[in-house]
């Protein structure tokens, strides 16, 4: 009886080991897109990409307080969202690529493909590239629309990095979203 229990525990450990290894490999340094990290100031982003074009403002509740939200388009389908604090405007989200399924038909521009994560993943990278760069491919979260868009999400301590692919239109990544948890 004890041998059977021990054998079951060993098999379970072997099954769970790849998931644990994958999660352990994602660091806070990996949580960047195009050189932008969660928490960077607006001035730091503008050093990299210029002033950009402001396109939206809003209000959000953060830590029980109403805070300002500011969104800027930096071209090449790069959009950054900031939250105001007593220290100024700080990055809470970076989005690169397309949101619309129809736009998945078009090839990303060379400029937008030049923006990448610290592990070299960019628009048009494939699922195989993700698995090679991050050591595993997480279970996809797929939309219910047709054709489905699947997100492959890697979690850090304070942020998540998600890669979106619509396999019916292209094997490559069409959108990347870095956001705080």
PLM-predicted stretches and their roles:
Residues 9-19:
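Bacterial N-terminal signal peptides
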Residues 40-97, 116-181:
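A cross-family detector of function-defining hotspots
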Residues 100-102:
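Acetyl-CoA-dependent GNAT
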């Amino acid at each position: 009886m004890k041998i059977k229990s021990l054998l079951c525990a060993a098999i379970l450990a072997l099954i769970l080991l790849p998931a644990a290894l994958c999660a352990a490999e994602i660091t806070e340094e990996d949580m960047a897109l195009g050189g932008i990290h969660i928490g960077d100031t607006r001035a730091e982003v503008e050093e990299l990409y210029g002033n950009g074009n402001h396109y939206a403002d809003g209000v959000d509740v953060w830590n029980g307080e109403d805070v300002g939200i500011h969104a800027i388009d930096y071209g090449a389908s790069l959009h950054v969202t900031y939250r105001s604090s007593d220290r100024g405007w700080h990055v809470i989200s970076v989005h690169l690529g397309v949101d619309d399924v129809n736009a998945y038909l078009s090839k990303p521009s060379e400029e937008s493909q030049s923006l990448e994560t610290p592990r070299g993943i960019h628009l048009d990278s494939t699922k195989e590239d993700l698995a090679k760069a991050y050591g595993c491919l997480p279970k996809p979260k797929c939309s219910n629309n047709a054709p489905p868009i699947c997100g492959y999400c890697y979690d850090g301590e304070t942020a998540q990095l998600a890669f979106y692919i619509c396999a019916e239109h292209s094997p490559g990544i069409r959108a990347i979203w870095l956001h705080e948890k």
